[in-house]
């Protein structure tokens, strides 16, 4: 039985009009979740190898 973790999806919301600068800084681990080579028994398990995933969004109005 494969174990599939829940991965949050972050979507950038668009503002109506252009009300100043929008600064977005994203610090996301590239390989936060990787699937190792398949195992003959269960097809491999998902392994979370990232300590934390951070997304910082700052708006200046």
Swiss-Prot record:
InterPro entries: Tombusvirus_movement. GO terms for molecular function: RNA binding. Signal peptide: none annotated. Transmembrane segments: none annotated. Residues 17-35 are annotated as: RNA-binding. Residues 15-45 are annotated as: Disordered. Pfam families: Tombus_movement. GO terms for biological process: transport of virus in host, cell to cell. Keywords: RNA-binding, Transport, Viral movement protein. Residues 28-37 have a biased composition (Basic and acidic residues). The keyword RNA-binding applies. Cell-to-cell movement. Displays RNA-binding activity. Homodimer. Belongs to the carmovirus double gene block protein 1 family. This is Double gene block protein 1. It comes from Carnation mottle virus (isolate China/Shanghai).
């Amino acid at each position: 039985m494969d174990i599939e973790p829940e991965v949050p999806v972050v979507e950038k919301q668009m503002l109506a009009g252009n009300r100043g600068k929008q600064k977005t800084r994203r610090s996301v681990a590239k390989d936060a979740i990787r699937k190792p080579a398949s195992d003959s028994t269960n097809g491999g398990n998902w392994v979370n190898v990232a300590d934390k995933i951070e997304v910082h969004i700052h708006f200046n109005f």
